[in-house]
From Swiss-Prot:
<feature type="modified residue" description="Dimethylated arginine">
    <location>
        <position position="23"/>
    </location>
</feature>
<keyword id="KW-0677">Repeat</keyword>
<feature type="disulfide bond">
    <location>
        <begin position="624"/>
        <end position="629"/>
    </location>
</feature>
<dbReference type="GO" id="GO:0005886">
    <property type="term" value="C:plasma membrane"/>
</dbReference>
<feature type="disulfide bond">
    <location>
        <begin position="343"/>
        <end position="605"/>
    </location>
</feature>
<feature type="binding site">
    <location>
        <position position="62"/>
    </location>
    <ligand>
        <name>Fe(3+) 1</name>
    </ligand>
</feature>
<dbReference type="GO" id="GO:0055037">
    <property type="term" value="C:recycling endosome"/>
</dbReference>
<comment type="similarity">
    <text>Belongs to the transferrin family.</text>
</comment>
<feature type="disulfide bond">
    <location>
        <begin position="9"/>
        <end position="47"/>
    </location>
</feature>
<feature type="disulfide bond">
    <location>
        <begin position="572"/>
        <end position="586"/>
    </location>
</feature>
<feature type="disulfide bond">
    <location>
        <begin position="19"/>
        <end position="38"/>
    </location>
</feature>
<dbReference type="GO" id="GO:0005769">
    <property type="term" value="C:early endosome"/>
</dbReference>
<dbReference type="GO" id="GO:0005615">
    <property type="term" value="C:extracellular space"/>
</dbReference>
<feature type="disulfide bond">
    <location>
        <begin position="456"/>
        <end position="532"/>
    </location>
</feature>
<dbReference type="InterPro" id="IPR001156">
    <property type="entry name" value="Transferrin-like_dom"/>
</dbReference>
<dbReference type="GO" id="GO:0006826">
    <property type="term" value="P:iron ion transport"/>
</dbReference>
<feature type="binding site">
    <location>
        <position position="462"/>
    </location>
    <ligand>
        <name>hydrogencarbonate 2</name>
    </ligand>
</feature>
Length: 696
């Protein structure tokens, strides 16, 4: 096999020199990994174009350029991130913060007329983030942005600004003569330390820096206590509490590649071997993370290593919603759609063809208050909401867990039992997850001997169909090999070649859609999993009402029209079997109701609009043939569960408190078995996931 070669793009003679010694040292050190070759261009933008045009394969970019590279026509994606800090707790981002002196009584929404200190024009923490987030408050016209900022603050020090055209942006700077406001250390208030000194020496009221700046400049805690952070929810917190009080997370520098045919595996293999041989303290011959010919060549000198970025992560998931919003606001041609407080419409995310049809009907009936965005599967929809391409959707608890890890929050819960006036103010305790079998199956089929049986699941990662039964099973067998435990099954969303796709039948109209986690697979969802039991399986993992909803003439489809409720039974955890209507005493676990999720900056808007929509198209509408009904679809649970009585307010909540500790534990056990690509991407920047964006 010919060795793969990764073509690295360089932007200066110094980088080209370091690259050629990288190339020589790698070919000596590594016998059969990928090789590196060097391509020279004159700027990052030229490198981005060269990678798109397949003249080069990789280059390291800062977060702002990762954003540019991800846009059309380049469409590059980040594939490897630099990390800073210790190996056992690698940091792949820093926090941009607003530092103020203790006792200066103003909040984030009262910055107008204050004096400001910035690291430099166009820099992430010092300019892009604070100005992008304050964009809505800036006076019109907002172009050029420097002019708007100059009239927003009373005076500033923004190194690199033009002192002739925007004298107020340089007024507070401390450089002498031509060096005042310079774009380098000749201006004493330049960079992180400079902007902090501008605040410290009382040339400004607020400094826009990164979370470590105060720690680095004031190692003594008593000195740090003289300062505070401004939080976006208009409170203040101590400077050490930056994880709960920051403006945005700025991800570290990343290596970008083409999204299609981008060599990402070779790039990772190359860099992973390179860090083994030439990383921190490895070899005197060549060092990846230091630059004898200059500073930050090819990689940042402060990096301590590389991490592979999950495949599902594109530039906007990597950069995060707050940072992308700030960048978008500041790009001249993209101004924000509407200011934060306006609520013109809710963009609903629909999965697959059937949901999209129902959503389109809803959109027309709502007079455009609901708009539809569609995706192929649930995870792609969640990703669209995270990125701000959609606003809301209703999810099963298993997906609420994933959405929560991605920073979304529950807004309204589906209620299934509560009817009438009070429904909207009383969220329920949850529904029951059960295991259903045919009564005709022998008595030896019970909860304790399911091995080798044929199983039917609503979908992988869903609550009643997967997380609860597989979580319980995992505790018993201590293994993730569920496909070897059951003989065959249909668990939509599994790997196509898995035995858990063997029973799936796909779509009537479009072959090749077997085992997809959407309505193209006829065995998908509650009704689908029950149909799988009826036609092929031994056990179905569903919710407690499914049998009642599809038997005794309630479902008119050919496969269901003659079914009787009495012909099915439930499996209890103690090994017994019970009639279907005794779920209260014979279930696997109580599952949290499905709920609508949104980004936290959209919570109020989504809740208000949906409560209006349900007042118009909710359960009280009797004739669904002539008017639109939110909670009706042909026994398919499209957009919402069909047995939803109303959407109920849940108050300000988090995904953890909504799902409850027991359920989180079940899912956390299964995390070891999880194949969710989105979950990998959303938890990449931090194992402990400090994405508590407080925007109200």
């Amino acid at each position: 096999v010919a060795q793969k070669t990764v073509r690295w793009c360089t932007i200066s003679n110094q980088e080209a020199n370091k690259c050629s010694s990288f190339r020589e040292n790698m070919s000596k050190a590594v016998k059969n990994g990928p090789l590196v070759s060097c391509v020279k261009k004159s700027s990052y933008l030229d490198c981005i174009k060269a990678i798109r045009d397949k003249e080069a394969d990789a280059v390291t970019l800062d977060a702002g350029l990762v954003f540019e590279a991800g846009l059309a026509p380049y469409n590059l994606k980040p594939v490897v991130a630099e990390f800073y800090g210790q190996k056992d707790n690698p940091q792949t981002h820093y926090y941009a913060v607003a530092v103020v002196k203790k006792g200066s009584n103003f909040q984030w929404n009262q910055l107008q007329g204050k004096r400001s200190c910035h690291t430099g024009l166009g820099r992430s923490a010092g300019w892009i983030i604070p100005m992008g987030l304050l964009y809505d408050q800036l006076p019109e016209p907002r172009k050029p942005i420097e002019k708007a900022v100059a009239s927003f603050f009373s005076s500033s020090c923004v190194p690199c600004a033009d002192p002739v055209n925007f004298p107020k942006l340089c007024q507070q700077c401390a450089g002498k003569g031509a060096e005042k406001c310079a774009c380098s250390n000749h201006e004493p208030y330049f960079g992180y330390a400079g902007a902090f000194n501008c605040l410290k020496e009382d040339a400004g009221d607020v400094a826009f820096v990164k979370h470590s700046t105060v720690l680095e400049n004031l190692p003594d805690k008593a000195d740090r206590d003289q300062y505070e952070l401004l939080c976006r929810d208009n409170t203040r917190r101590p400077v050490d509490d930056y994880e709960n009080c920051y403006l945005a997370q700025v991800p570290s520098h990343a290596v970008v590649a083409r999204s299609v045919d981008g060599q990402e595996d070779s790039i990772w293999e190359l860099l992973n071997q390179a860090q083994e041989h030439f990383g921190r303290d490895k070899s005197p011959d060549f060092q990846l993370f230091s630059s004898s010919h200059g500073k930050d060549l090819l990689f940042k000198d402060s990096a301590n290593g590389f991490l592979k970025i999950p495949s599902k992560m594109d530039s906007s998931l990597y950069l995060g919603y707050q940072y992308v919003t700030a960048l978008r606001n500041l790009r001249e041609e993209i101004s924000p759609d509407s200011s934060k407080n306006e609520c013109k419409k809710v963009r609903w995310c629909a999965i697959g063809h059937e949901e999209t049809q129902k959503c389109d009907a809803w959109s027309i009936n709502s007079g455009g208050k609901i708009e539809c965005v569609s995706a192929e599967n649930t995870e792609d929809c969640i990703a669209k909401i995270v990125k701000g391409e959609a606003d809301a959707m209703s999810l099963d608890g298993g997906y609420i867990y994933i959405a929560g890890k991605c920073g979304l929050v529950p807004v309204l819960a589906e209620n299934y039992k509560t009817e009438g006036e009070n429904c909207v103010n009383t969220p329920e305790k949850g529904y029951l997850a059960v295991a259903v079998v045919k009564k005709s199956s022998g008595p030896d089929l019970n909860w304790n001997n399911l091995k080798g049986k044929k199983s039917c699941h609503t979908a992988v990662d869903r609550t009643a169909g997967w997380n609860i039964p597989m979580g319980l099973l995992y505790n018993k067998i201590n293994s993730c090999k569920f496909d070897q435990f059951f003989g065959e099954g249909c668990a939509p969303g599994s790997q196509r070649n898995s035995s858990l796709c063997a029973l799936c039948i796909g779509s009537e109209r479009a072959p090749g859609r077997e085992c997809l986690a959407n309505n193209h697979e006829r065995y998908y969802g509650y009704t689908g999993a029950f149909r799988c039991l009826v036609e092929k399986g031994d056990v179905a993992f569903v919710k407690d009402q499914v049998v009642q909803q599809n038997t005794d003439g309630k479902n008119k489809d050919d496969w269901a029209k003659d079914l009787k409720q009495m012909d099915f039974e439930l499996l209890c955890q103690n090994g017994a079997r019970e009639p279907v209507d005794n779920a209260e005493n014979c279930h696997l676990a109580r599952a949290p109701n499905h709920a609508v999720v949104a980004r936290d900056d959209k919570v109020t808007c989504v809740a208000e609009e949906l409560l209006k929509q349900q007042a118009q198209f909710g359960r009280h509408v009797t004739d669904c043939s002539s008017s639109f009904c939110m909670f009706k679809s042909n026994t398919k649970d499209l957009l919402f569960r069909d047995d939803t009585q109303c959407l109920a307010r849940v108050g300000k909540t988090t995904y953890e408190s909504y799902l409850g500790a027991d359920y989180i534990t079940a899912v956390a056990n299964l995390r070891k078995c999880s194949t969710s690509k989105l979950l990998e991407a959303c938890t990449f920047h931090s194992a402990k996931n400090p994405r508590v964006e407080t925007t109200t």
